[in-house]
Regions:
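Short, surface-exposed beta-strand/loop micro-motifs that present aromatic residues
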Residues: 161-164, 244-247, 349, 449, ...
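Short beta-strand elements of solenoid repeat domains
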Residues: 257, 294-296, 303-305, 312-317, ...
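Zinc-dependent metalloendopeptidases
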Residues: 1-299
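Residues in Ca2+-coordinating acidic/glycine-rich loops
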Residues: 297, 306, 730-732
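Acidic glycine/aspartate-rich repeat arrays in secreted/surface proteins
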Residues: 77-85, 146-171, 177, 183, ...
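Secondary-structure transition/turn motif
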Residues: 30-33, 85-88, 111-114, 260-262, ...
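Active-site-proximal structural scaffolding
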Residues: 132, 167, 200, 240, ...
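GD-rich hexapeptide-repeat beta-solenoids
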Residues: 25-36, 159-167, 172, 177-186, ...
Length: 753
């Protein structure tokens, strides 16, 4: 069953025995006789040797640096804390709490634990050994600290006797249980196990709650570790090669420097936190309330973590991870592929040489990268971000929409799951939109754009740009200022955003192609496409499929190859032309001209406008309907029907028929003109649908009188001076007429009357 984690206040209450020294400063001594001893230790008394006194003095110094009272060495056997050896009434070592009796505050050591005891040596204890830790432990008792559990001597076990999770020497030197019980590993690079060399986290917190803090301890700018200025060998890692310490510091801009170590480190500058060095874990801690500002790692792959104030973290060489925490931090990655995260606050991040990864979470963060300093990446959750010079890549790690701008380098920009806008700038960039409806603009350079899922928009300004889209990944649009562009596979729409003329080509999907204000050519290819010409004289070709084409302003040309194609033109929007291969076609509203470009024959119908209808090489039937139309038959045996209005009829080669269906198709208000009547080609003028005598029942045929004048008989048809006229009511005046150019005479055989 897992043990509970106690709060700091609860642990302090557990460690505080309630017995304290009072009256200001404290004294300690090394008595040379046992006259003051009232208990069983007296019989086996002996004074400490010089090595023991040095160890005791060192350990006293550790405690002295923590609390407001100052320790003074005295020769008196009435000192507050007295150190002595005994071989009686003792196991390994023990001490008495503060009090009024002569024995109160005394620390007793068993000299039988000497050189043969290895790390348990109490006769010549070395810093880092169990024996030295025992000195620190017993002084804690002499100052009023209790064990963290209900045990005293014997052989208690962590599982059975520890009351809370933090009961180990990792947290308090007053514990009986080694640091590995709570996950620390104090086996160092030399393969040996080391022990606490100072009071630990909760020792410091408790002793300062009793006696107050020493506000003069290392109150300047202090460096701990290598290049130490702490003034104590235990904090100088050129002397203390295998540190197991807790750092207390009162003031100043302080540094934890592990630069001299050959082994990777983990540094955490948070008060109450642990750091790893010399192949150990959780062997360096920082006291609660102590603020260390700066950290220096090793040449290996380190992890450095700041705290809530302004930190300077230096990773040196190696692939380091630097995390600033709160405050306005400065992070130096050094050589290697480093990860730099300033945390909250306006931070300055310098990755150095190598492929570095920056996490930017504050708009005030500044990244400084040198030229040729590797391929570097920024990841950010900010809503908008612009890459600094010499930083190549940008990845959005937030949850909302994102606007990202590249730099002059070759960038890789990655969006997130929402609607992002990525702008590559200069360089040959790769833009990855991810999910969402993204806008990707590679800028100048040869770019690769991949929108991912969603309805994406690509801005293409280089003919070498590449767009990658998967099938069924949304409805996507290309915006381009190039003079010509063809949609890649799986992209639906194309919009021209330039200022000149444009040639745009679709693909096999359902495309929407939009031109600009100049003379554009849009080709839809397969699919049911929509084409918008915009301003200018445009050519719109929907290709296969049922297409919709909107020419806009200008004289537009439409290519129609499907009977279901729809052409939409506005009023007074230019003179527009249909090119079609269909066998039958009728002009829609506001479209003026129709040209057959197929291989067979066409039945072509105009509308109420002035149309130009042009047939092909087959036997075409062209009908102008309303308006002053021009019908051009081309090759073949064509039938031309001008309809209402003053029409111009050009049959072209072949035996053509010029058909008139109503008197008002060509009367005194709007005479039609036949431009190329050729009797040798067997052309005919078809008047068979006209009633030659309005006064008689039925449809009467005309009587051709050659070049003679009308004689007042209804139904006479005359041709003179290039004008064909008919009198249908016998009044001697022309009721119907047609101009026939370049013809001097006609015969009845050239009519269908």
């Amino acid at each position: 069953m897992a043990k509970s984690v106690w709060t700091s206040d609860k642990i302090v209450a557990q460690l505080d025995s309630g017995a304290h020294w009072s009256g200001g400063n404290l004294t300690y001594s090394f008595p040379t006789n046992a006259n003051w001893v009232a208990y069983g230790e007296k019989a086996g008394f002996s004074a400490l040797n010089s090595a023991q006194q040095a160890a005791a003095t060192s350990a006293i110094g550790m405690w002295d640096s923590l609390i407001a009272p100052k320790f003074t060495l005295t020769a008196s056997d009435t000192a507050d804390i007295k150190f002595a050896n005994t071989t009686t009434s003792i196991g390994y070592a023990h001490a008495y709490f503060p009090g009024q009796s002569p024995t109160a505050g005394s620390v007793w050591l068993n000299p039988n634990y000497g050189a043969n005891s290895g790390t348990n040596n109490l006769v010549d204890p070395q810093v880092g050994q169990w024996g030295y830790q025992a000195y620190v432990h017993e002084i804690g008792h002499a100052l009023g600290l209790e064990h963290p559990g209900n045990y005293n001597g014997g052989s208690p076990t962590y599982q059975k006797h520890a009351l809370f999770q933090q009961d180990s020497q990792q947290y308090t030197v007053m514990s009986y249980f080694t640091a590995d019980k709570t996950g620390a590993d104090w086996i160092a690079s030399d393969g040996k196990r080391y022990y606490a060399q100072t009071p630990m986290l909760y020792d410091i917190l408790t002793i300062q709650s009793i006696y107050g803090e020493d506000t003069e301890t290392r109150d300047g700018n202090t460096t701990y570790g290598y290049n130490s200025t702490a003034g104590d060998a235990v904090f100088d890692f050129t002397q203390n090669l295998h540190p197991v310490i807790c750092i207390y510091d009162s003031y100043g801009i302080d540094t934890l420097d592990l630069s001299g170590s050959s082994y990777a480190c983990v540094i955490n500058l948070d008060p109450g936190s642990f750091s790893n060095s010399d192949m150990m874990t959780s062997n360096i801690s920082i006291a609660f309330g102590t603020w260390i500002e700066d950290a220096i790692g090793t040449a290996q792959n380190d992890i450095l973590r700041g705290n809530a104030i302004d930190n300077v973290l230096s990773g040196l060489n190696g692939n380091d991870i630097l995390i600033g925490g709160g405050g306005s931090d400065t992070l130096y990655g050094g050589e290697g592929n480093d990860t730099l995260d300033g945390g909250t606050g306006a931070d300055t991040l310098l990755g150095g040489a190598g492929n570095d990864l920056y996490t930017v979470d504050d708009a005030g963060d500044v990244i400084i990268e040198g030229a040729n300093g590797g391929s570097d990446t920024v990841q950010t959750a900010l809503a908008t971000y612009t890459l600094a010079n010499n930083v190549e890549n940008l990845t959005y790690i937030g949850t909302g929409s994102f606007i990202g701008y590249g730099s002059a380098q070759d960038n890789v920009l990655k969006g997130g799951a929402s609607h992002d806008q990525l702008f590559g700038g200069n360089g040959n960039d790769t833009l990855l939109g991810g999910n969402g409806n993204d806008l990707l603009d590679g800028g100048s350079g040869t770019d690769i754009l991949q929108g991912g899922l969603g309805n994406d928009t690509y801005v293409v300004d280089n003919a070498s740009d590449t767009i990658l889209e998967s099938a069924k990944a949304g409805t996507d649009t290309v915006q381009t200022n190039l003079a010509t562009f063809t949609l890649a596979n799986n992209i639906e729409n194309l919009v021209y955003i330039g200022t000149g003329s444009f040639d745009g080509i679709g693909n096999a999907l359902v495309n929407t192609l939009t031109g600009g204000d100049q003379n554009d050519t849009l080709k839809g290819l397969a699919g049911n496409d929509i084409l918008y010409g915009g301003g200018g004289d445009d050519v719109l070709d929907g290709g296969a499929g049922t297409d919709k084409m909107f020419g806009g302003a200008g004289d537009d040309t439409y290519v129609v190859d499907n009977a279901r194609d729809i052409v939409t033109e506005g009023v007074n929007a230019g003179t527009d032309t249909i090119l079609t291969t269909l066998r039958s076609y009728t002009l829609g509203a506001e479209v003026e001209n129709l040209t057959f470009v197929g291989t067979g024959a066409i039945k072509a119908n105009g509308n109420a406008l002035d149309n130009v209808i042009t047939g092909g090489a087959g036997n075409d039937t062209l009908s102008g309907y309303g308006g002053n139309d021009h019908l051009i038959g081309g090759d073949g045996k064509d039938i031309l029907i001008g309809g209402a209005g003053a029409d111009t009829l050009t049959g072209g080669a072949g035996a053509d028929v010029f058909r008139f269906s109503a008197l008002n198709d060509s009367n005194t208000l709007s005479y039609d003109t036949i431009t190329d009547f050729n009797a040798a080609e067997l052309d005919k003028i078809d008047l068979s649908q006209l009633d030659a005598n309005a006064g008689a029942r039925g449809n009467q045929a005309f009587s051709f009188i050659g070049a003679a004048s009308f004689t007042g008989v209804a139904g006479q048809l005359s041709f003179s001076n290039g004008f064909l006229s008919a009198d249908v009511n016998g009044d001697g005046a022309s009721d119907f007429g047609v101009w026939i150019l370049n013809v001097t005479s006609l015969t009845a055989a050239q009519f269908w009357l």
